[in-house]
A protein has these predicted regions:
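CBM-like carbohydrate-recognition segments
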Residues: 314-327
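Structured, solvent-exposed acidic/aromatic patches
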Residues: 1-287, 291-307, 311-315
Length: 327
């Protein structure tokens, strides 16, 4: 992302194509935060200048990101940049996320600001001013919010979602050195994911379903066990991490991660026409809930958390999966 963004930003700046520069810098900021949150210190100020660039401290990188986000927001709010005659036409073929709509990119940038500021809680600058700044950024983002999604049309090769069934069985996924298959056709859910995250029950419950988390049916479908054994029934099986399956079992005895209900694919992520989410409304609401909690308003924090959960349930179409039994 960084190399491509640098080329876009440099060439756009030279041509005064401010709309393209804004999009490129926003993506660079997103990528920088994701990378430093994972790895800590990293090259930034000297990135791409040599084979052994200086490693900037994570603290200095956050200082740069906080400055960059304010400059970006200022440019998004300034018609001198957003309506410049030198801006280039940007459509869906260039911008797969918002088709060049800078208003939508602006609200995404406010969301990134909220994500940046959240890092100050609870141990860095946990005070009323920080909490209010986060809440304000979230509110500005929500004023014109649209989920930030990279959508796939389906078809051949890279036209399919990287988590789609097209890449489920092969290591390379048909993309050669450019990509890898997701191997979900041979993946088995872990004990931690099933028990600690989803709260799976020992067996299906006619009233409660398969797990505490009703999204389980949007993630996977149960499959029968080995025929001729005492465990031939249809169950949500799983394995402990790094523990192999018994010799009588095959991958087909464990849940499929390309779930179906009444013969219809239901996962929003593992379909070939799925999407990669860059920022969702649920995250915005949870960020606001966190800030509201630390500001002392726990009832509102709880309400926001519940609202985020409901939106996520709607995202996974639970009402259509469960039908009349879903409440």
């Amino acid at each position: 992302i960084g190399v491509n963004a640098k080329e876009i930003i440099d060439e756009a700046h030279e041509a005064q194509a401010w709309n393209l520069e804004l999009i490129g810098r926003t993506l660079r900021l997103m990528s920088t935060q994701m990378t430093t949150d994972l790895f800590g210190d990293m090259p930034r100020s000297e990135a791409y200048e040599s084979n052994s660039p200086h490693y900037d401290t994570q603290e200095s990188i956050y200082e740069w990101m906080n400055q960059e986000i304010e400059e970006l927001i200022g440019m998004y709010e300034d018609p001198t940049y957003t309506e410049a005659a030198t801006n280039i036409p940007i459509d869906q073929s260039i911008d797969r996320v918002f088709a060049g709509d800078l208003n939508k990119w602006k609200h995404y940038t406010y969301a990134l600001k909220a994500r940046l500021l959240l890092r100050k809680l609870p141990n860095w600058e946990n005070n009323a001013a920080t909490c209010q700044a986060i809440i304000t950024a979230v509110n500005r983002a929500l004023e014109g919010w649209e989920d930030v999604l990279y959508r796939f049309d389906g078809g051949n090769g890279a036209q399919n979602s990287p988590w789609g069934e097209a890449f489920g069985s092969t290591e390379q996924g048909g993309l050669g050195w450019e990509g890898r298959g997701n191997m979900l056709n041979s993946a088995v859910p872990t004990k931690y994911f099933m028990e600690n995250i989803l709260g799976v029950f020992e067996s299906h419950n006619n009233l409660k379903g398969w797990a505490e988390d009703p999204r389980i049916l949007a993630f996977m479908s149960a499959r029968p066990g080995p025929s001729g054994t005492s465990d031939s029934g249809t169950e949500m099986r799983y394995l402990d991490t790094n523990i192999g399956m018994d010799v009588s079992y095959k991958v087909d005895n464990y849940p499929t991660l390309f779930p179906e209900v009444d013969g219809k694919k239901v996962s929003v992520y593992t379909q070939n026409t799925g999407y990669v989410p860059l920022f969702l409304e649920e995250e915005l609401l949870l960020i606001k809930a966190e800030a509201t909690y630390w500001s002392g308003d726990k009832p509102t924090a709880r309400s926001l958390t519940m609202q985020a959960a409901e939106i996520n349930f709607d995202r996974f179409n639970l009402s259509s999966i469960y039908g009349s039994s879903y409440t």
